[in-house]
Amino acid sequence: MINVLLVDDHELVRTGIRRILDDIRGFKVIGEAKNGYKAVQFSRQHAPNIVLMDMNMPGMGGLEATKKICRYCPDVKIIVLTVNCEDPFPSKVMQIGAHGFLTKGAGSDEMVRAIRCVHAGQRYI
């Protein structure tokens, strides 16, 4: 079972992703967070396998949350979800510890593929 934490300040986005993942055998959404602070807190308490992390959120954003989760929970793997796909942004998030990068326009098949790749120890860009 791949345990996933969804992090996005838009409830509609979290709900949509949850619906996709709930239909995939072997995936379980174990929590949701609407900002980076709650994502770090949840990750420290529950150690999800994968965090799907939005970058632009009020308060602590995705970059800072990714750094903190990588520091405190090195076994948790992070896939960044964002609308910003222009260089050097993908390289930057991978350098700070993210394991994967997806644009928010990616289809459900690509999201599932990214989660499986990252869970298997590979990087996904």
Language-model features, listed with the residues they occupy:
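Active-site residues of response regulator receiver
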Residues: 8, 54, 82
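Receiver (REC) domain active-site loop signature in two-component systems and cognate sites
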Residues: 57
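Short hydrophobic/Thr-rich beta-strand motif most characteristic of the beta2 strand and flanking loop
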Residues: 26-34, 42
